[in-house]
Amino acid sequence: MDLYLKNTTFVIVCFKSQEVIYDCLNTLPKEANKIIVENSNNLNLKKDLESKFNNIEVIINENTGFGASNNLGIKKSKTQFVFILNPDVKFREDTFDNLTKTCRSI
C-alpha cells in the first residue's frame, strides 16, 4: 500500500470550506499527497493547513470555478494517481484500500 500512497495525490477544491476540510484531511492517508486549491484567498487557512498536515500543498487561487481549479490541482500533481474530492468527503478506514484494489484491476 505504501507504493500506492506515495504515487497518489488527492486534489480538493475549497471555497470557504474551513468548517469541513479538517475532517476530510484527517480521514485521508497521512502518507498520500494532498493539494488544496483554496478559492477564497484565505491565507490563514493555508498557513494553518500547511502547519498541521504532512504532504500538503495549499494553492491560493483566484476563484476560477470548480473545474478550472481541479485542473490546476491536477497539473500541480506529480503522481501517477490523482483523486478529486470535495472538502466534505470523509474516508472510511478501508476506502483507500478499496480504491487501490480497483485501480489494480483496471
Predicted regions and their residues:
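A conserved acidic beta->alpha catalytic loop
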Residues: 27, 36-47
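Short, well-formed alpha-helical segments that are part of the catalytic scaffolds
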Residues: 14-31
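Short aromatic/hydrophobic "clamp" motif used to bind/position activated sugar donors
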Residues: 82
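Short beta-strand/loop segment that forms part of the nucleotide-sugar
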Residues: 32-41, 57-60
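Conserved donor NDP-sugar-binding/catalytic core segment of glycosyltransferases
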Residues: 93-106
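The conserved acidic donor/metal-binding loop of glycosyltransferases
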Residues: 86-90
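Cell-envelope/extracellular polymer assembly enzymes that use nucleotide-activated donors
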Residues: 7-9, 33
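Glycine-rich, basic loop-to-helix element that forms the pyrophosphate-binding segment
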Residues: 60-77
